[in-house]
Amino acid sequence: MARSPGRAYALLLLLICFNVGSGLHLQVLSTRNENKLLPKHPHLVRQKRAWITAPVALREGEDLSKKNPIAKIHSDLAEERGLKITYKYTGKGITEPPFGIFVFNKDTGELNVTSILDREETPFFLLTGYALDARGNNVEKPLELRIKVLDINDNEPVFTQDVFVGSVEELSAAHTLVMKINATDADEPNTLNSKISYRIVSLEPAYPPVFYLNKDTGEIYTTSVTLDREEHSSYTLTVEARDGNGEVTDKPVKQAQVQIRILDVNDNIPVVENKVLEGMVEENQVNVEVTRIKVFDADEIGSDNWLANFTFASGNEGGYFHIETDAQTNEGIVTLIKEVDYEEMKNLDFSVIVANKAAFHKSIRSKYKPTPIPIKVKVKNVKEGIHFKSSVISIYVSESMDRSSKGQIIGNFQAFDEDTGLPAHARYVKLEDRDNWISVDSVTSEIKLAKLPDFESRYVQNGTYTVKIVAISEDYPRKTITGTVLINVEDINDNCPTLIEPVQTICHDAEYVNVTAEDLDGHPNSGPFSFSVIDKPPGMAEKWKIARQESTSVLLQQSEKKLGRSEIQFLISDNQGFSCPEKQVLTLTVCECLHGSGCREAQHDSYVGLGPAAIALMILAFLLLLLVPLLLLMCHCGKGAKGFTPIPGTIEMLHPWNNEGAPPEDKVVPSFLPVDQGGSLVGRNGVGGMAKEATMKGSSSASIVKGQHEMSEMDGRWEEHRSLLSGRATQFTGATGAIMTTETTKTARATGASRDMAGAQAAAVALNEEFLRNYFTDKAASYTEEDENHTAKDCLLVYSQEETESLNASIGCCSFIEGELDDRFLDDLGLKFKTLAEVCLGQKIDINKEIEQRQKPATETSMNTASHSLCEQTMVNSENTYSSGSSFPVPKSLQEANAEKVTQEIVTERSVSSRQAQKVATPLPDPMASRNVIATETSYVTGSTMPPTTVILGPSQPQSLIVTERVYAPASTLVDQPYANEGTVVVTERVIQPHGGGSNPLEGTQHLQDVPYVMVRERESFLAPSSGVQPTLAMPNIAVGQNVTVTERVLAPASTLQSSYQIPTENSMTARNTTVSGAGVPGPLPDFGLEESGHSNSTITTSSTRVTKHSTVQHSYS
């Protein structure tokens, strides 16, 4: 088919357009000739619509802004078609990191560089150029642009390590490679800029030069100089690296350290310190050190080249010795590991060879020649102990022995002396015999049977019974040795086979029954057994058959499965044909099982009936019903009945407990404010019309205040502040002498007892209540005093009718068996116990006769204070504090100084006064003091000699009082008493008459007449060191800061007051009892003789609490 000419022309035109048509052209606008990599083109060359150009080359580290634009792309379609073409570049430096390296003009296609290039960071840039129309579509094929960064020598070599470490053996051959060092250069590889050259800068030690360095590879080799570790163990090299093939430039040069350690080789032969060695061992010793072999080696310490290796050359064929190396000291330790006997060998000679643990170096291997080292060991003879020739012996006995064999000798276990080989003098005892089969003769070691052997005993293991025996030598030091006796028991056939489980239960669907027997005898008198079923009752052997038999058991099978219980008799014989006389019976129950849960319980009909116990109880109940009418016949009926006879004296016998004292009586308390002659009233807390007295200064706790009398509670105890009465003021204090008001009633707890300090007029109105209160207070104080010397055996108690808490030690502890309680107060218990005394004595008691007997002189003391409280007429309350100086002479005892004054009945009252706020100083350890503390106490009383007949107590009778006593102690605070240290004691007595009589000094009791007045004493005592004054009161051993309470009570009845009791005029009564308690003082001191041995400068407190017919002085620490 012929083609048309028009188509041929169209094809030709298309070819022409393809060859001549527009394309994207790249033009490199500038190049550098010095690179010699890119040829210079005077014009663009077209190859099939694409411009092929060489890559662009730019040098690093230069300012390239003067060379912009470095490239340009252009499309011919812009002129041919008149299109608006925009150009774009992508790639590293523009759209990929690092950004901002290049910028382009989208209209002209020019590419500019904006920063200095770094080849080490980016050695090559690959960009892609695009020609885009207005819609962003490519109008030309994208064109690649390669930009290479040319390198410059801007980096120096850097070592990979600051310190290189290597090693080489000593005695190494020349040119031995030691190690290789390495450095890197960041410039372009395989160029002159990155070619590194190495060099050794220095070497320590510098001479001789033992290493050289390959400058191109960095390898270090040894020279021909021989390395010796014993001379230099290490070397240090300083090396440097330069690029440019070692060209010297002004760039800094990096250096590194190279440390080379010389390795040790076994090139030294060990040397022994001593050529001949000796040692000594005791016989019969083992694991003891004999000697040490000292070795020297010049090789590296601790290495195998240094450690010595010892071997026996000769003499140790018996294996007596062992040698090992001490890794710390490199010494050979020779140890005896096998006992030697002096009698057999007295000397041991052997030799050893010394080498190293590591093999010798080839350089000295031919020079080493082993030399034996002789060692001589002497055996020391010692006194040996005892021993058994054999530590274990065997004795054979039979189980068939009868009782006559007990005590039979079955063997002996003799110990021998190792030195002489003769039997030793020793004692033999059993160490272990669990079933006490034997006895051992302690002298001859003979072993006797103490119990018949039993093969079946649980202590027999495999037919052997074990006993251990200890032999103790008689010589000193004693030595012991232990031996073992094995008693082999010969078994006899004395046991027959028996069933292990004679009662069994199986389910009806079980095929077999396992029947097992046992025999306590051993082989051959036990298994295997023979089993046979005895046909009793007939047919049993057919019903139960033996299906399979083992050594000691059989499997029994039932021919007919039938529920119920069966008793199957067996004949079981042992291996010797011996069987038990009685047949072995197996009680077997075959039952129906429910799903494997066991047999179903058999159903039985329930039966309810009375048992024998129920019938017996019914008969017993019937008999009891018959017995009740018989008991009713014995009761009294009608007139014959009698009532209960009351027990006489039930009111006295059934004493109402927890009720102390008589019931209180309600009485009206009259006014206690008398009017004096001047019309002034006595205040509620004081006494009017008191004379002014000077106040005593010092450390005393007693304050004398003008016109005032009061009590206050300070620091847990009572302190009294009062003033002196003088002149006519005492005439208006009332018939009973009461100077305390009703509002000053307080409880003093310093003595440990409850004391009611009510006024004397209140006692006159409620006499019975006050009497009982005083009585129980005295008794409680006495019991408390005794309790302080004993450990408390009960706790503090509070009774229901007490006004305050109980004492420190309860009055329940009033009877200590081991104590020394003075029970003489039972001699006179007062009127309250008169009825009880008459009942006990069976006779009437005359009270007046008893009082007349009491008026006779007596020397023994009692506690009868409450029984005479009805006669109280004057109450004086005072409390003074004495401060002692630094030291005083040691006083005499109180009994010796005042024995003549105690001529009548003496009543002792004790109290304890404490002052908690005052710190108690620790007494100094002075055994004796150089001075004394003297306190003088004297009482003078007078009264009418007419026997009184009645008791009259009333407030209208004038009376006189004891007002005060003063004590001056030598102390630093008593500066206002210049005569306090003169060493004198002054006692001043004043008498105040009821009708205004003045007070005159008295010389003694001989001036007092039997007139109706009461002497009031004002005494001034000076506590001062005085050798000429006889003390009447010795102070206890007290320390600084402690207190001593002195209590004085004085009663003197006035003639105008009728009294039922009389104190004779010619007698003077003073009683003192001192109780010392506190640190360093155990308790009461007898005979009132208290000496001061501790530190002085103490405080003494004197207080008067109430008036009795006696005088009591009390001392106590606080």
UniProtKB/Swiss-Prot annotation:
Residues 1-23 form the signal peptide. This is Desmoglein-2. InterPro entries: Cadherin-domain_protein (IPR050971), Cadherin-like_dom (IPR002126), Cadherin-like_sf (IPR015919), Cadherin_CS (IPR020894), Catenin-bd_sf (IPR027397), Desmosomal_cadherin (IPR009122). Pfam families: Cadherin. Residues 1068-1077, 1095-1118 have a biased composition (Polar residues). PANTHER family: DESMOGLEIN FAMILY MEMBER, DESMOGLEIN-2. The lineage of its organism: Eukaryota, Metazoa, Chordata, Craniata, Vertebrata. Residues 1068-1118 are annotated as: Disordered. Palmitoylated by ZDHHC5 at the plasma membrane. Keywords: Calcium, Cardiomyopathy, Cell adhesion, Cell junction, Cell membrane, Cleavage on pair of basic residues, Cytoplasm, Disease variant, Glycoprotein, Lipoprotein, Membrane, Metal-binding, Palmitate, Phosphoprotein, Repeat, Signal, Transmembrane, Transmembrane helix. Disulfide bonds: none annotated. Expressed in undifferentiated pluripotent stem cells, expression decreases during differentiation (at protein level). Expressed in hematopoietic stem cells and circulating endothelial progenitor cells, expression decreases upon increasing cell lineage commitment (at protein level). Expressed on common myeloid progenitors, pro-myelocytes, pro-erythrocytes and B-cell linage progenitors (at protein level). Expression in mature cell types in the bone marrow and mature leukocyte populations is absent. Residues 50-160, 161-273, 274-388, 389-503 form the Cadherin domain. GO terms for biological process: bundle of His cell-Purkinje myocyte adhesion involved in cell communication; cell adhesion; cell-cell adhesion; desmosome organization; homophilic cell adhesion via plasma membrane adhesion molecules; maternal process involved in female pregnancy; mesenchymal to epithelial transition; negative regulation of apoptotic process. The keyword Repeat applies. It is a single-pass type I membrane protein. It is found in: Cell membrane; Cell junction, Desmosome; Cytoplasm. It is linked to Arrhythmogenic right ventricular dysplasia, familial, 10: A congenital heart disease characterized by infiltration of adipose and fibrous tissue into the right ventricle and loss of myocardial cells, resulting in ventricular and supraventricular arrhythmias. Cardiomyopathy, dilated, 1BB: A disorder characterized by ventricular dilation and impaired systolic function, resulting in congestive heart failure and arrhythmia. Patients are at risk of premature death. It comes from Homo sapiens (Human). Residues 635-1118 are cytoplasmic. Residues 24-49 form a propeptide.
